[in-house]
Amino acid sequence: MIKKIISFAVIVSSFFIFNTYLHAATGPANIYKITITKVELCETGSTLSNCLNPVDITVGDGVADVDIAAVTAGESAGVVADFGKGIPGKTYTYVQTILSRSVNAKGSVGSCYTANDAASGTANGYATGTQTSGSEAEVTLLVPDFVDPTNYSMIEGSSDAAGTSLRVAGTVGASDTHFRARKILTTPYTAKAGINPTVFLAFGTSGAIMNKAGTCGSAQTLAAAPPDQTVTIQGQ
């Protein structure tokens, strides 16, 4: 699937980045719905593992079931964050986002297709697929649980949508319902009073379904993999 460019007046999101996790094979998603519950900006001095002086820029309660696989160039997937909430004069270098572990997706990896067989994403993040292409269906997949603080210090699991109870960096647990992820901005953003920049996001879902080792159709092998994503800010 081609990369899609999305233009937002006051929106930004970050997404999980462990696309090499478990070295699993990946395939395209035709449907890929995510839920974003909180977005924060991180001041200069922040790192992948630490958001310095975070400022909450979430609009309302965030957005649910945004299908990033269906959004075409120039369309908005919903307003989730307002850069106007940044503190004037402060410069921000990272964005930090809380997302649901659950992803509604439809797609395949090779000859293994997502299947609505009531065996959707289990607590460890994997679901049973099908080898019959005609049975492909939208299903709930989960971001897999993992422990890898060396390579994924930008991610930590959360037991709630607000991020009030977080695991240590590089860990997502089976009982977590959400996770928090940090991503560096392509260009630092300096907040100015009365000015909201235009934020461009580029999503690609050609590798958004993940398939680990096992027999498709009898073993739980499918999980959500991250879409390609970049954030660019204009009009500062």
Regions found by a protein language model. Give the residues of each.
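A short, solvent-exposed, low-complexity linear motif enriched for acidic/polar residues
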Residues: A24-Q236
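Sec/Tat signal peptide C-region and signal peptidase I cleavage site
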Residues: I17-A24
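Bacterial N-terminal signal peptides that target proteins for export
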Residues: M1-A9
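Generic N-terminal leader/processing signal
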Residues: M1-I2, I17, A223, P227
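Bacterial N-terminal signal peptides
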Residues: A9-I17
